[in-house]
Amino acid sequence: MSHKASLGQLALTYCGKFLPLEVLQSAAGHYIGTRDTEGPVSRESREYFRSYAAAQRALERGGWSQLAIP
């Protein structure tokens, strides 16, 4: 499923935070998620991407799938 949004839905639903989507990185790879001043808040994308560039393209083009639950 293609998804295009600007705010993290899981961050809003589960944490009550309006946070912009951005590319983040974990040991598993790059993903689309949110963070605040304390660090990562939510992983929003179902997918992990092999590179920052691939994740950024997916974010810009809406080529990623929203996780339903954290």
Feature locations, PLM:
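Secondary-structure transition/turn motif
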Residues: 34-38
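Short N-terminal "domain-start" leader segments
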Residues: 1-33, 61, 65-70
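A short, exposed loop/beta-hairpin motif centered on an aromatic-Gly-Thr core
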Residues: 39-52
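An amphipathic, aromatic/His-enriched active-site/gating alpha helix that lines ligand/cofactor pockets
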Residues: 58
